[in-house]
Every structure is written in C-alpha cells, then in structure tokens.
C-alpha cells in the first residue's frame, strides 16, 4: 500500500516526535515525555485503524513498555491485535494491510495477532509473553473483548509460578553481564542495577496484587515513603538518561557506550573538574544509581517472596538480638538498631560467623538500610563500634561476604567516609576495568582466597606466606586503603597512607601495626614496578629494593598485597610471567634481607647448576665451555641456570654457525613460550624479531639481548598470545623456529608491520604517551621508559625508530596492563651522548606512539 494516503499521519508522527524531543531537551521530564510519546502513538494508531476500517470486533492492545504507557524514543511499539476468533482470509489480508500501513506511517511496530485462547496458551508457555500481557492496555476497538481477555488472564494467573519464572529470568539476565553493574559500558536497561531490575519489582508487585507504582509499594508496607521516593528518583534519573541516549543515537541504544558518555554528561549539565572528565562524573552517577537499584531489588524481591511463599519455619536463636529463620539472618526486633547502635555492625559480624546464612530477612534488611543512613561521626568515634569493625576483619571466615554486604547496603561507605567518596568512581586508565570500590573489594577477596587451604595450588607461595602471617587483618586494611585516595589529585598512594594511618590509630592499632599498614598503602606499587620495569637479575637492583622494604615481614606483606592487587585490576592483566617475576624478586630480596651476597654467590652457583642440568641430558660437563668462553659476566648475571643450560644444549657444537639458530619451548613460567635466537649480530635483528611476533599477534613480555665476544647475538624472548587462541603447541613451536629463522635471513627484505587500530575505549579516553630517557645507574647505557596506549605492532614501531637512530637494545621489559603498556628498554648508541640527539629521539618516539 502506498504511503501517500497516510502522509498526514506520517507528518504528525514526525513533527510530534520532534516537538517532544525539543521540549524534552529544554526541560527534561522523563515521565512527561514517555506518557506524551505513548499518547501520540495511541492517537495515530486509533486513527489509522479507523481509516482502514479495521473490524470493530477487533481490539488493538498495547503491551510491554508501551502498554505501561512508557514509550522511549527508540523503542519498538509493541501491540497485539486481539481477535474474537481465528481470522478468515479476507480479515488476514486486512490485518496485513494495517501492519504495512503502520510501517508506512513510520511506526516500527512489533505485533502479534491472537485470539483470547491463543493469548492464554502463549502466556502459559512463555513468561515473556505473560509479562507483556500483564501490562496490556486497550488502545482501540472492542472493549468487551478486551475485558473478557483481562478477566480470563487474571483468573488463570499463577503468582507463584510467575515469581519463580521472573526471578530465574533476572538471574539469567544478570549472568549475561557477569553479575556486575560496573562495566565500562553498562546497559541502561538490562545490566544489573538497570531499569529492568525496577520493572521486575513492578511486575512482581502486580503479581502480589499491590497497587501500581512506588507509592503503592510504600502503602503495602514494603518501603517507607522516604525510601520509595529515593527509588523513584533514581528510576526517573535512569529513564531521563535513556531518553537522552536514544535521542543522541537517533535509534534504540541502551548501552552507555564511550561514544556517548561525554555528550550525555553535557546533556545533564555535568562539566569536567580539575581531576575528572565530565563522562567520569556521569558514570559515577550511574553506578551509584545502579547500586541503589540493586539494593531496592534485593529488599523488595525478598519481601515479595515472603508474601507469596510465607515462611513457616521456626526461628533458631543466635544471640539475644538475632536469629536464623529459613536460612536468613533476622533481627528479633527490627528496632534493635535504634536501641542498640552497635547491633548494626554486630549483624555483619554474625553474618560472617555463620556461613549457613544465605542473606538477610527482608524486614531486617530494610532496618539495616535505614540504620546505615544514620551512621555519623559519633557512631564512628564509639570505641565499641571500632572494636567490632576490627573484630570482623579478624574473623577466620566470611570477611569478604560481610564487607560486600556492608557495601551493598550502604554501611561501608558510611563507616569509612573516604571509601564512600570513591563508590562508583571509574578509572579510565586503560588498565582497571572495575570502579575503585569494586577493585578494592576484589583485592580484599583475592587476599582472602590465599587463606583457603583448598585453593593453595593456585598461588602456593602466597598461600604459604599468608598462613604464616601473624595478623592478616593488617593486609585487609591495606587493601581497603590502597586506592582510596584515587581521584583527589596528587599521589594517591601517599594520600591513602595518611588516611590509613589515621584510621589505624583511631581503631587502637599499635605503632608497629599502624606503620606497616600505612607503609603498604604508600608502597603498594613498588614491587610490581620493580619486577616489571627493572633488571631483577642485577644484584644492585635487588639491594636497592631490599633496602626500601627493610625486613622480611614487610616483604611478605608487600608480595601478598601486590599479587592480590594486580589480579584485581582486570581478568586479563595477570599472567604466569608476571607471577614468575614477582616470585623471583621476592626470593632474591628475601635472600638479601637474610644477609646473602648475591653478587658473589649468584654467578658461580648458577654456572654450577647449569652444568648439573646439562649432565641430566647426557651431555659432558664441559659441553657449555665452547659457548661460555665467548660470554661476559653480564650474561651470567642476567640469565638463570635453566636458561643457561638450555642455551648451551641448543648451541652445542653450533656456536660458530653461519646462519640463525632459533629454538622455542613452552615457557618455564607456565604460560606462553620462550624463544632463543642465535645469529651473527646485525643492527636489524631486534627489529626483525619484533616484526615477526607482531605479524603472528604474539606479545613480547621480555627481551634479553646479548652480544657475544665473537660477534653473535644471543637473544632470549618471553612471548605470549594474549588472545589465548587454541593451537597445537608442538606444531606452533616448529613454525616459530622455521619462520623466524627465515625472517632473520639478511637476504630477505624486512617485512614492515601495519600499525594496529586503537580500541574505542582508547579513542574516547586517550592516554597520553610518555617517553623518558635517563642514565642507567647500573651501567653505561640509557634507560628508555615508554608509557602509552597499546596497539598491534607497537613494539615493532619503537624498535624501527631506535634502529633508525642507530641505537642498540640490550634489554627490554614489556608490561601490558589491559589496554596500556609500560615498556622499559636498556639502550646504547653513540647518538645518545649528545643532548640534542636524545631530545630528538624522545620527540620522534612520541610521534610514533601517536
């Protein structure tokens, strides 16, 4: 059918939507927009149905969000054509013409055609259909038919079955988002804490015959009027944000993508501050709203469950104030938190001590929520309350879940105000993927996992150290404060250490323990930076690190916090290589703190261990001598005994080869591969190797470059596939050995690598490239430090630029932190002696890095 007969309706829809959008931008009232938009579509559909002469026995029904009277700018118009009987062919054609006319007018409809019997059968078979029909609203047509449908729908409605189905649906939806509201680009509608969580509450309230809306829920006694107003306010804010997002995108878009965050912030009048982008302020507002929505969802679903499934189990006493009922913690008197303020913290201590508790009974949960809002300076200053908080941290079990519950229901941020300030604060550093508060609690969880004997195989050293640590609660305090000063400007480690010191003193810790916690917070980045940026085979590096640490207790604590911290930044940042570097640094520093002279004992011991290793392979004791006579002391200082033995085995009787020898093996670190290259030295070897690994999309983690006395390059690379592709390693190792040897043939032209593209995250949150050159304190070269956004081919681009400046690389450490890299190179070259040349190199590298 031509759209011409309905051109006026099409224009009414277009101009009506434009008017609504303009009015909304001028004065953003979400409920007003949604209702007016639904009314506009109601009028057009009714007129269209009348013009087309749709049979009056038919009823046009709005369902879903449109049925609720909430029509977002980009949402589909979901309708049902309700029929008194199965349609005849002529009626079917008329209905098809009606649907086509809707599209011609510009209405993107989602439609179904059903009789009442078919509706009820579909509702019984599919809870999504049942939910849509729960919000059915007549738009046009047969009132009697719609009333008959309503009566029959309510008569067969099984509230308990509906409740179970919607709860299972919510669990599945949350699982699609990893049960986390704190994604970098959350879904406004479907993520945990999004609008759909609020819709679920409304649907379940309807199932319990509670009047619609938050005021109805308050009248039913499930929330106070004040609590209902708070939840309604957050619902309006989320709806307002979703309307803006649809208008900006020009279509349905529910993901808070990086592309829109800054513009949305501007729509809401949020400006950047000295330390935070406007988009970051927007996202903190979103995450805080999501947290309140999750809290309301928890409380109300529990309350509605009790209405539908009354608990008949008798309570089991726990103490004078709390009891266990049906697996939930229940206050014997909900007013206990008013009469005994210490009961608020005791509730979570009880929760930690009783792992059989699945959560809090809903009335108790509401009482906790209300009481948490009254935590003030006087509450925090009460000695009994401080003692309870420290007692919670000292519990052998349940600490993580108790602190997470305190956080979820608003108590943790009230008790530690500095923690409250970082709730929902995102970190756009291309490294952390969690908000600061979620990261802190994840680090604490990681520390607690080290204490679980059944998980000791995951991190054996960490498990052994924490089992022997006399006061693990000090580690948990350090975890709580290590990033608590993020977003303030300045050094967050130093500022956090001040906060930690004050908190520890207030909570009665002695000077030794207070000093340790504050020191850990201040130094929490030192061990990771040392292991990943410096040459930890150098005794001078170990001596300097050990001097900063001071004693083995601090070393143990710092190692534990560092491993937990790195593992808590992102699911992808930790790898076995980082673990090996940290363990190697720990053992070397421990030996130094115990009085060992690493410079004297290290090389001789490693050489002897390498000879023993060679003998295990049936090689003579002097098998390494031919190679070793061409190597200087630096080689023996930088490689461990296993690597030295491997090199000697692979190069036995091949130390004067004319071509390249490439050997690869699975990395002894337990992840990735180790590649040895031995070839006549040339300026382009490092560049060619970097090009090869870039082409096969492997990330270089570490490179040790050594030149022998007889003019050969003996290089070792630790590389890893960060995409974790499923490949057959035996074939892959053979491929690397053959193809890399071919690429090192000087007769073959160097194959350039095209630079990879930046991710959307990197484009919208650019990370400024930093290049810094300084003298190597331990040698005669220079240390080149580079920090920038990661992309494919980056190391090749850096290596190519260094070669162009006639600079040799003799060591490289590549630290990939999510979408950011922090690379450190030890370099030499005549041009580095001239300050203008050094400045030119830094500038040209910045150009390469973009």
From Swiss-Prot:
<keyword id="KW-0378">Hydrolase</keyword>
<comment type="function">
    <text>Modifies, by uridylylation and deuridylylation, the PII regulatory proteins (GlnB and homologs), in response to the nitrogen status of the cell that GlnD senses through the glutamine level. Under low glutamine levels, catalyzes the conversion of the PII proteins and UTP to PII-UMP and PPi, while under higher glutamine levels, GlnD hydrolyzes PII-UMP to PII and UMP (deuridylylation). Thus, controls uridylylation state and activity of the PII proteins, and plays an important role in the regulation of nitrogen assimilation and metabolism.</text>
</comment>
<dbReference type="InterPro" id="IPR006674">
    <property type="entry name" value="HD_domain"/>
</dbReference>
<dbReference type="Pfam" id="PF01966">
    <property type="entry name" value="HD"/>
</dbReference>
<dbReference type="InterPro" id="IPR002934">
    <property type="entry name" value="Polymerase_NTP_transf_dom"/>
</dbReference>
<protein>
    <recommendedName>
        <fullName>Bifunctional uridylyltransferase/uridylyl-removing enzyme</fullName>
        <ecNumber>2.7.7.59</ecNumber>
        <ecNumber>3.1.4.-</ecNumber>
    </recommendedName>
</protein>
<dbReference type="InterPro" id="IPR013546">
    <property type="entry name" value="PII_UdlTrfase/GS_AdlTrfase"/>
</dbReference>
<feature type="domain" description="HD">
    <location>
        <begin position="436"/>
        <end position="558"/>
    </location>
</feature>
<dbReference type="GO" id="GO:0008081">
    <property type="term" value="F:phosphoric diester hydrolase activity"/>
</dbReference>
<comment type="similarity">
    <text>Belongs to the GlnD family.</text>
</comment>
<dbReference type="GO" id="GO:0008773">
    <property type="term" value="F:[protein-PII] uridylyltransferase activity"/>
</dbReference>
<dbReference type="InterPro" id="IPR003607">
    <property type="entry name" value="HD/PDEase_dom"/>
</dbReference>
<dbReference type="Pfam" id="PF08335">
    <property type="entry name" value="GlnD_UR_UTase"/>
</dbReference>
<dbReference type="InterPro" id="IPR002912">
    <property type="entry name" value="ACT_dom"/>
</dbReference>
<feature type="domain" description="ACT 2">
    <location>
        <begin position="783"/>
        <end position="850"/>
    </location>
</feature>
<feature type="domain" description="ACT 1">
    <location>
        <begin position="674"/>
        <end position="755"/>
    </location>
</feature>
<keyword id="KW-0677">Repeat</keyword>
<feature type="region of interest" description="Uridylyltransferase">
    <location>
        <begin position="1"/>
        <end position="317"/>
    </location>
</feature>
<dbReference type="InterPro" id="IPR010043">
    <property type="entry name" value="UTase/UR"/>
</dbReference>
<keyword id="KW-0460">Magnesium</keyword>
<dbReference type="InterPro" id="IPR045865">
    <property type="entry name" value="ACT-like_dom_sf"/>
</dbReference>
<keyword id="KW-0511">Multifunctional enzyme</keyword>
<dbReference type="Pfam" id="PF01909">
    <property type="entry name" value="NTP_transf_2"/>
</dbReference>
<dbReference type="InterPro" id="IPR043519">
    <property type="entry name" value="NT_sf"/>
</dbReference>
<keyword id="KW-0808">Transferase</keyword>
<dbReference type="GO" id="GO:0006808">
    <property type="term" value="P:regulation of nitrogen utilization"/>
</dbReference>
<keyword id="KW-0548">Nucleotidyltransferase</keyword>
<feature type="region of interest" description="Uridylyl-removing">
    <location>
        <begin position="318"/>
        <end position="673"/>
    </location>
</feature>
């Amino acid at each position: 059918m031509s759209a011409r007969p309905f051109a006026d309706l099409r224009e009414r829809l277009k101009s009506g939507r434009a008017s609504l959008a303009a009015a909304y931008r001028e004065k953003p009232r979400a409920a007003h927009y949604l209702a007016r938009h639904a009314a506009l579509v109601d009028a057009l559909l009714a007129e269209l149905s009348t013009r087309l002469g749709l049979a009056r026995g038919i009823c046009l029904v709005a369902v879903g969000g449109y049925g609720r009277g909430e029509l977002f700018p980009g949402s589909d118009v979901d309708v049902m054509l309700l029929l008194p009987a199965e349609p005849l062919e002529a009626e079917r054609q008329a209905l098809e013409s009606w649907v086509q006319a809707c599209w011609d007018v510009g209405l993107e409809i989602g439609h179904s055609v059903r009789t009442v019997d078919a509706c009820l059968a579909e509702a019984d078979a599919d809870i999504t259909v049942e939910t849509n029909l729960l919000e059915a609203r007549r738009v046009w047509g047969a009132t009697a038919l719609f009333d008959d449908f309503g009566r029959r729908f309510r008569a067969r409605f099984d509230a308990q079955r509906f409740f179970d189905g919607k709860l299972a649906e919510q669990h599945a939806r949350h699982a699609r988002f990893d049960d986390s509201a704190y994604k970098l680009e959350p879904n406004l509608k479907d993520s945990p804490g999004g609008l759909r969580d609020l819709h679920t509450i409304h649907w379940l309230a309807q199932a319990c015959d509670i009047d619609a809306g938050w005021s109805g829920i308050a009248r039913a006694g499930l929330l106070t009027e004040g609590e209902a107003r708070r939840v309604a306010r957050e619902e309006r804010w989320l709806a307002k944000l979703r309307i803006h997002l649809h208008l900006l995108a020009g279509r349905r878009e529910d993901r808070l993508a990086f592309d829109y965050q800054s513009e949305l912030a501007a729509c809401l009048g949020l400006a950047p501050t000295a330390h935070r982008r406007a988009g970051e302020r927007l996202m903190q507002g979103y995450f805080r709203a999501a947290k309140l929505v999750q809290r309301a969802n928890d409380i109300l679903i529990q309350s509605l469950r009790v209405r539908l499934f009354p608990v008949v189990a008798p309570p089991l006493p726990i103490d004078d104030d709390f009891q266990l009922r049906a697996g939930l913690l229940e206050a014997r008197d909900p007013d206990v938190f008013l009469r005994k303020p210490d009961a608020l913290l005791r509730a979570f201590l009880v929760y930690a001590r009783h792992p059989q508790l699945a959560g809090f009974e809903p009335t108790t949960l509401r009482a906790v929520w209300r009481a948490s809002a009254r935590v003030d300076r006087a509450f925090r200053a009460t000695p009994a309350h401080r003692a309870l908080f420290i007692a919670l941290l000292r519990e052998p079990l349940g600490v993580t879940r108790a602190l997470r519950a305190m956080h979820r229901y608003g108590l943790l941020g009230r008790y530690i105000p500095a923690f409250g300030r970082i709730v929902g604060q995102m970190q756009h550093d291309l490294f952390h993927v969690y908000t600061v508060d979620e990261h802190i609690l994840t680090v604490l969880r990681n520390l607690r996992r080290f204490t679980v004997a059944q998980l000791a195989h995951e991190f054996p050293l960490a498990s052994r150290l924490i089992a022997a640590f006399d006061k693990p609660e000090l580690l948990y305090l350090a975890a709580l404060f290590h990033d608590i000063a993020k977003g303030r400007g300045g050094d967050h480690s130093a500022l956090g250490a001040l906060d930690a010191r004050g908190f520890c003193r207030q909570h009665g810790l002695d000077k030794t323990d207070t000093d340790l916690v504050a020191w850990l917070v201040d130094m929490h980045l030192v061990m990771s930076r040392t292991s990943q940026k410096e040459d930890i085979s150098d005794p001078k590096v170990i001596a300097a690190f050990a001097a900063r640490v001071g004693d083995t207790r601090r070393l143990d604590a710092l190692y534990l916090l560092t491993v937990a911290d790195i593992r808590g930044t992102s699911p992808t940042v930790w790898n076995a290589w980082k673990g090996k570097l940290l363990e190697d640094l720990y053992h070397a520093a421990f030996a130094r703190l115990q009085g060992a002279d690493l410079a004297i004992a290290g090389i001789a011991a490693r050489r002897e261990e390498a000879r023993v290793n060679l003998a295990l392979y049936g090689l003579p004791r002097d098998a390494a001598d031919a190679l070793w006579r061409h190597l200087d002391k630096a080689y023996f200082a930088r490689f461990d005994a296993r690597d030295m033995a491997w090199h000697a085995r692979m190069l036995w009787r091949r130390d004067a080869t004319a071509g390249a020898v490439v050997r690869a093996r699975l990395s002894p670190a337990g992840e990735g591969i180790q590649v040895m290259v031995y070839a006549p030295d040339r300026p382009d070897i490092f560049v060619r190797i970097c090009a090869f690994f870039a082409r096969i999309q492997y990330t270089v983690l570490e490179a040790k470059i050594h030149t022998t006395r007889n003019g050969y390059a003996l290089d070792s690379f630790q590389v890893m596939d960060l995409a974790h592709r499923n490949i057959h390693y035996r074939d892959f190792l053979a491929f690397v050995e053959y193809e890399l040897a071919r690429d090192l043939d000087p007769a073959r032209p160097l194959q350039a690598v095209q630079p990879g593209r930046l991710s959307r995250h990197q484009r919208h949150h650019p990370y400024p490239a930093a290049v810094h050159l300084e003298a190597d304190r331990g040698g005669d070269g220079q240390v080149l430090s580079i920090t920038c956004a990661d992309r494919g081919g980056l190391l090749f681009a850096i290596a190519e630029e260094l070669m162009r400046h006639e600079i040799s690389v003799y060591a490289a450490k590549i630290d990939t932190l999510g979408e950011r890299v922090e690379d450190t190179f030890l370099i030499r070259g005549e041009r580095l002696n001239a300050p203008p040349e050094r400045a030119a190199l830094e500038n040209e590298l910045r150009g390469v890095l973009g």
